[in-house]
Amino acid sequence: MEAGDDIYIFDLGNGSMENLTQYQVPWPNVKAVLITHMHSDHIADLPDAHLQSWVQGRNSPLIVYGPEGINLVTQGFELAYSADYQYRNEHHGDDMLPMTIAGFNPIQIMDNQLIPNGTPGLEILPFVVDHHPVNSAFGFKISYKGRTVVISGDTIHDGSVQKYSKDVDLLVHSAISIDLVERMREIAPLPQLNKILFDIQDYHTTIKEAGEISRDANVKPVSYTHLTLPTTLQ
């Protein structure tokens, strides 16, 4: 999401960095990453985002806003990549890749509390959604210069997204096709995959429900995400 020259990235699942590279995202302009919840298909590319922003001149640890436990995620990545940080620093030097800049700055988000940021006129409001058994999942309402966008995150249709989406300019809503999932179940080569494909249906919004949310919230432009299953089957 761009607000003036500043960029904010929402979720970084596997494959995100490839897309962002194709978009030629200017990493020095990226102010923060915001995580809706901590399923692997929403955080897997955080380490690559760290590397690209570090190499391209980030001047402080990468800010990551996320639910309770986001500090454990970033600490885990820092531990896993600690040798990598050291190797790159020793190879390229402090002027290029200072160790003081390596790592993350995790900040826990709270329900219905604005996220502080350094972009004039930008408001980012997290709100709780229902992705049980995920015990901390959020959507975001973003306002900038009179325009508003809501990002649902992964959720069932429990009313939260509709409440925050009333009359916004754009709704970005996750949705799954039950028909597609059922067809995938029919050809699943393993019983474990069949079970997973059955289970995921009870904590996502369907395409039909997402359309109803858009209609009832009076939002005409709606962008669907999560339509095809990621490799993690989440």
Model-derived segments and spans:
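Binuclear metal-dependent hydrolase catalytic cores
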Residues: 1-150, 156
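Loop/turn elements at helix/coil->beta-strand transitions in domains of secreted/extracellular proteins
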Residues: 6, 218-220
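Conserved small/polar residues in nucleotide/adenosyl-binding loops
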Residues: 225-231
